[in-house]
Amino acid sequence: HTGVWEATPGVTRSIKGDTFEFCHLLSGVVEITPDGGSPVIYKAGDSFVMKPGFVGVWKTVETVRKIYVTVTPPA
């Protein structure tokens, strides 16, 4: 799956399950904190991958717009 996603500031719980998600931020700022880990800040122009099994907090600091690609490996 691919798409464009946008969100206003706020906090949500993120649970990836068995899916990889590639993200490229077109605008905005997010802070992603894995459970038991340290927060990482991503800004417009940054790209990152959320791996299967990720559990943590996604905080939209500034309204964010991203393109994404999700891939679920075969069982």
Residue ranges: model-predicted function:
Residues 1-17, 51-53, 74-75:
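Conserved short histidine dyad/triad with adjacent acidic residue
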Residues 12, 38, 47-48, 52-57:
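Histidine-centered metal-chelating micro-motifs
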Residues 33-37:
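Short alpha-helix capping/helix-loop boundary micro-motifs
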Residues 44, 52-75:
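Ligand-binding loop in jelly-roll beta-barrel domains
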Residues 14, 32, 66-68:
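Short hydrophobic/aromatic-rich beta-strand segments that constitute the beta-sheet cores
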Residues 17-32:
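Short, conserved beta-strand element in jelly-roll/cupin
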Residues 3, 38-40:
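Short beta-strand segments
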